[in-house]
Amino acid sequence: MFKILVAEKIADTGMEILKKNADIDVKIGLSHDELLETIGDYDALIVRSATKVNKELLENGKNLKVVGRAGNGVDNIDLDTATKKGIIVVNTPESNNVSTAEHAIALLLSVCRNIPQAYHSTVHGKWQRSHYKGVELFGKTITILGLGRIGSIVAERLKAFGMKVMAYDPYISDERVAKLGIKKVNSIEEVMKLSDFITIHLPKSEETIGIIGEKELSMAKRNLRIVNCARGGLVDEKALCKALEEGWIAGAALDVFVNEPKEGAKGGNFESPLLKYENVVVTPHLGASTVEAQNNVGTAIANQVLAALEGNIVDAVNLPSLNIKDTDYIAPYIRLSETLGKLYYSSQKDAIDSVEITYSGDISREQTKLLILSFLKGLLEPVVKERVNFVNVELLARNRGIKVTESIKNQVDYYSNLISAKIISKGKEITFAGTIFGKEEPRIVDFAGYEIDLAPTEYMLAIEHINQPGVIGQIGTILGKYNVNIETMRVSKNRKGENSIMILSIDQTIQKETADEIKKVPGVLTAKQIKL
C-alpha cells in the first residue's frame, strides 16, 4: 500500500478517499527540519501553500513519487527539481471556478450598491440612505477580460442580470463568443470607452501585467467600476489610485493585490494605498474560499495523487505521466509536438478556428492521442489563465471554440516520420511541421509555410523580410550593437521567391528597443521573438 503524508489540512471528503486507498499519516504543522527527517518514508506528499517543497526536501524524499498541491498555485514547489527527479506534481486548477466567478459577481454588486460601506456606517449607529445611493446592473455594459472557464461562467451569470455582456480575449474564436451570446471587443481602448463595468479573469503574464494602466484608465467612462478577482498587478495599482483620486472612474472592487500577506496572516498587517478610498471594496483573496470549493479541492487532490501513484495519466503540472510501454520511442515526438504548438502563438497572435494534425510514417502507428494533447498544451499554455495539462487541454480548446482533427498518412516522401500542423485563423492557413533526426534531435522543417531545417532552441528570432541584399547584415549589426550573440541562422525563401524568413538562435531575449530597431530595417516585414 502506498504511504501518503498529508502535511496541511484538506477537506474531509478528500481524507476519506485517501484513507480507503492508501496508508495515510496526517502531520500538520511540521517544521521544515521535521519534514526533512520524515519525508523519506513516503510515496506522496500533500500540501497547500504554506509548506515549502524545495530542492532539499525533494532530494530527501528517496521514495517520493508525487507531490499534490491542494489548490491552484505551485509557487511553493520547486518544479525543476521535481521534474528532474521524476516526481509528478499535481494540483486542482478547476475546483474553484464557480466560487471565483460568484465572488467576482458578489464584488460587482457590492461596489455598485456600496454594501460594505453602508454596513460599516449602519453598525456604527448611522442611517445614511441617501449617502449610499447605488447603481443598477440592468441594461449596463460589462466587459469580461479573459473568456476562459471562469470568465465564461461569469458571462452566463451576468446575462441573467439583463446586462450587455462583451468580452476581450484575443485568443478566443468568434464562434465561441457567439455561442455564449455575447459580443467580442477587439482592443483595450474599445473596452475602456464602451464599458460601464469591467471584470478581469486573465492569467498573469508579461503580456497581461498592467493591462489596465494610466493610459487606459484615462480613456474610461467616468461611471466605470472595475472588478479584479484574477491576479494582483493586472490593474496597475498606482494608476488605479490616480484614477480614483482624479475621478476618472467611479470605483473598484479587488480580491487580489500585488503584495499580499502570506496565507494565515492575522488581520491588521495588510497595507495598500487603495484602502483609503471609500469607493473601493476589498477582500483578502477569497475567490476560492467556499465550503464547496474546498470540498472539490480535497476530492480532486486525493483522486489525482492516487491516480498518479497508480501510473495513470493525470493532471500533472510539470510533466505528463505516460502510461504507455515504449516511452523511450515516443517521448521525443511528444516534446516535438509541444514545440510545434508553442511556435504558433510565439510567431502569430490571431485567435484559432481549427487545428488539424497529420502524422506520417511509423509514428502514425503509435498512441497519437498523446501527441495531439502535447501539441494543444504547447498551443494554449502561453495564453490561458488555467493550468494546462493532458487532462484539461482538450476541454480548454473546446471552450475556446477550436475545432481539433487528426489524420494519418502512412507514408511520407522525405522523412521517416513527420508531424504536421495546419492551423486555420480568420480564414488564413498557417502550417508548421517537424521530425526527429537520429534518436532524439528535433527539427522544424516547415515554419509558417517556409521550408526550413531548424533545430529549435530556447531563444529565437523569426524575421520575415523582402528578398533583397543587405537585410541580414543590418540585423546582425543591430544584434551585435546590443550584445546579443547569434548562435545559428537559417534562411528560407517562400515558394514564390518574393519573401524570405531568417530564423536566428540567440543567447538571450531581446529588449523592446532592440526589436523596434530591427523592425525599422528596410525590407523587414515582421520580427517575432520566440521563447520555448
Predicted segments with their positions:
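Phosphate-binding beta-alpha-beta segment of Rossmann-like dinucleotide-binding domains, i.e.
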Residues: K85, P93-T141, L145, I153-F161
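N-terminal glycine-/charge-rich "phosphate-binding" loop or analogous flexible N-terminal tail
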Residues: M1-Y42
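Rossmann-like adenosine-cofactor binding region
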Residues: T51-L58, I172-E271, S289
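A conserved regulatory-domain signal marking ACT and ACT-like small-molecule sensing domains
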Residues: S321-L532
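Rossmann-like dinucleotide-binding domain for NAD(H)/NADP(H)
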Residues: V89-V90, N223, C229-Q348, T368, ...
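Hydrophobic/small residue at the entry helix of a nucleotide-binding pocket
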Residues: I150
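Oxidoreductase and adenylate-handling cofactor-binding alpha/beta cores
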Residues: A101-H120, K140, K159-M163, A243, ...
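Phosphate/diphosphate ligand-binding glycine-rich loop within oxidoreductases
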Residues: E8, A44-Y119
